[in-house]
Amino acid sequence: MKPPAGMVFLWVLTSLGAGIGAKIVKEGNPHQVYTLTWQIYSQSGEVVWEVQGNHALNTWWPALTPDFCQLAAGLDTWDIPDRSPKNLETSMEGTSQQLTPQGCSKPWKRCALTERDFYVCPRDNRDRATAHRCGGYEEYFCSAWGCETTGDAYWQPTSTWDLITITRNYTKPDSCDDRVERERKTSRHWRDPLSLPLKITFTDSGKRALGWQTGYTWGLRWYLPGKDRGIILKIKLKIDTITQTVGPNLVLADQKTPVQLAIPVQPPRAPTQTPRVNPVNSTLSPSLGYPAPAPGPRPPYPTSPSRPGTGDRLLNLVQGVYLTLNLTAPNQTQDCWLCLTAKPPYYQGVAIIGNFTNHTNAPLRCSTTPRHGLTLTEVTGYGLCIGKIPPSHQNLCSQTVPSVGQGPYYLTAPNGTYWVCNTGLTPCISLQILNDTADYCILIELWPKIFYHDSEYIYGHYEPGGRFRRDPVSLTVALLLGGLTMGSLAAGIGTGTAALIETNQFKQLQIAMHSDIQALEESISALERSLISLSEVVLQNRRGLDLLFLQEGGLCAALKEECCFYADHTGIVRDSMAKLRERFKQRQKLFESQQGWFEGWYNKSPWFTTLVSSLMVPLILLLLILMFGPCILNHLLQFIRERLSVIQALVLTQQYHQLRQFDAERPDAIE
């Protein structure tokens, strides 16, 4: 059976959405709170049910309770094809082709439907064989037994991989047999048109799925006499950023006139021994850093202040630090210098101990976190830590709270403070994400990195002969290696710099820089050729326009332009590039002439140096053995022969006795 064209289009659209859905993942701070809306779509493409809440991603999995008649409204296969999900009534006129006792148009039909079981089959996450066996939309993905993964039937269909479970969220009636009796009994219990609610819960696999933003589709079929009828439903997650209304719309009930901030005036202090607070001539607001409004009548609608420039923001930052320092430590602001660092990091965090607030519902402050995680490279002090603190960061913790509890709670930092986590800077923490991950957070105060110096520090830089402590000097690679290519080796002989220039690594550095400059030259040459081609096209257009305005004296006369000519300076660029290429060739020849006949081997392949270094020692040892091995072996054999001869003589002497010798002339002389 060929499915309708609308079903084929919906199947293709859902397939494409499921394919890209796994790639849609919000990046940035995982504690960021969004407005999450779980929506259920019917087969006609309408949103029949939804629930909304403010939560962090992957933390809110509510039970979805749509009504079956909402999903069946508008379908030709049921008895309310002319109804929408929002205008269902107690009794509705059914269609003539749907005269079965089960349906949604009458209370007794709804009662009869509650006696039946239903089963659910998924469309997504199936392999090709299962999809072929279970069918498509026309069979509600349940064309064969065994395709069902959930439902509320007597055989209890289940699965280990499906994303949801669907059960009935109503009580099954005792009996709905007699129509007259049904009319009387069901007048009270089934008069509500939404009396067939379902309960959809998420499984562990569903909580790990990444395609909820594009949605997943299921087919639900009732176990009825004859052909099992059913519906198609789709579950989708909508993610929105929490917004706040700003504007002069007086229709809004909570519209309030913004308060215009002004600088608080410090009351005069009585003369005491303590130093007074230094006066500050400022027209800046300590909260916003914008100029204070001039006195006068207030405009009918609030006006937005102009955004200050970069210089104004930096000056406001320094002045805000001075105001704070002047108020807290007046002794330190008598004569000082505040210097804003010109290199990162621009902010520092100071760990503190404070009392955080536990919220059941996410406050508005939790939605103001930056999208991208901000990293603090300098955090000092001792403060409050939450989570699994690694050993490298335990020195920042004066008090550690390994676990606050379980549940969908949100921990907000006190006003003026932040949580700095391994995922970034945030004013709010989702407790569920903190417990499920290896995240950790530290309570900090955020301060701009501004150096404080006394007056003597600055004066010492300008007064001749002044003595002051020197700051550490930062040396770059250019300062460390400068002068090696110019032949000034005398200064580096004592530190072994002379050996550095002779190494192959330094020559490779020169070759790498040479290749980089050559690539730059090729890019400029390509740009020059493109410019020539463009100029040719422009000149062709110019000649064409001159022909069109020939009666007016040409294009320049028609435009009344005094200077109307083209100056081609690409020849200068071409000559410069030719000279640069010539210098490249000379430098390449110089590199090749300085290399020995064996040094060129190392430049042929990157692994040749490692191979030769690894095989050199065994080859040298083998060569020495072949050269001196025979001589050493001969001496060793000769030494062994001598030792064996001595041992053989000793063995022979043990088998004989020495005879007595006597002189025949002197028989009495016996030796």
UniProtKB/Swiss-Prot annotation:
Topological domain spans for side Cytoplasmic: 633-671
GO CC annotation terms, alphabetical: host cell plasma membrane; membrane; viral envelope; virion membrane
Reported modifications of this chain: Specific enzymatic cleavages in vivo yield mature proteins. Envelope glycoproteins are synthesized as an inactive precursor that is N-glycosylated and processed likely by host cell furin or by a furin-like protease in the Golgi to yield the mature SU and TM proteins. The cleavage site between SU and TM requires the minimal sequence [KR]-X-[KR]-R. The R-peptide is released from the C-terminus of the cytoplasmic tail of the TM protein upon particle formation as a result of proteolytic cleavage by the viral protease. Cleavage of this peptide is required for TM to become fusogenic.
Motif YXXL motif in this chain: 656-659
Motif (CX6CC): 556-564
Record's keyword terms, sorted: Cleavage on pair of basic residues, Coiled coil, Disulfide bond, Fusion of virus membrane with host cell membrane, Fusion of virus membrane with host membrane, Glycoprotein, Host cell membrane, Host membrane, Host-virus interaction, Lipoprotein, Membrane, Palmitate, Signal, Transmembrane, Transmembrane helix, Viral attachment to host cell, Viral envelope protein, Viral penetration into host cytoplasm, Virion, Virus entry into host cell
TM ranges: 612-632
Record site: Cleavage: 470-471, 650-651
Glycosylated sites: 169, 281, 326, 331, 355, 358, 415, 435
SUPFAM superfamilies linked: ENV polyprotein, receptor-binding domain, Virus ectodomain
Residues annotated as signal peptide: 1-22
Pfam families: TLV_coat
Listed Polar residues bias regions: 271-286
Region (Fusion peptide): 473-493
Extracellular face of the membrane: 23-611
Residue ranges of the region described as Disordered: 265-310
Segments of skewed composition (Pro residues): 292-305
Keyword Kinase included in the entry's annotation: no
Coiled-coil portions: 501-550, 560-596
Region called Immunosuppression, residue ranges: 539-555
Cysteine disulfide partners in this protein: 121-142, 134-147
Lipidation (S-palmitoyl cysteine): 631
GO aspect biological process, one term: virion attachment to host cell
Task performed by this protein: The surface protein (SU) attaches the virus to the host cell by binding to its receptor. This interaction triggers the refolding of the transmembrane protein (TM) and is thought to activate its fusogenic potential by unmasking its fusion peptide. Fusion occurs at the host cell plasma membrane. The transmembrane protein (TM) acts as a class I viral fusion protein. Under the current model, the protein has at least 3 conformational states: pre-fusion native state, pre-hairpin intermediate state, and post-fusion hairpin state. During viral and target cell membrane fusion, the coiled coil regions (heptad repeats) assume a trimer-of-hairpins structure, positioning the fusion peptide in close proximity to the C-terminal region of the ectodomain. The formation of this structure appears to drive apposition and subsequent fusion of viral and target cell membranes.
Cross-referenced PANTHER family: BC035947 PROTEIN-RELATED (PTHR10424:SF72), VIRAL ENVELOPE PROTEIN (PTHR10424)
Name of protein: Envelope glycoprotein
Native source species: Feline endogenous virus ECE1
Encoding gene (name): env
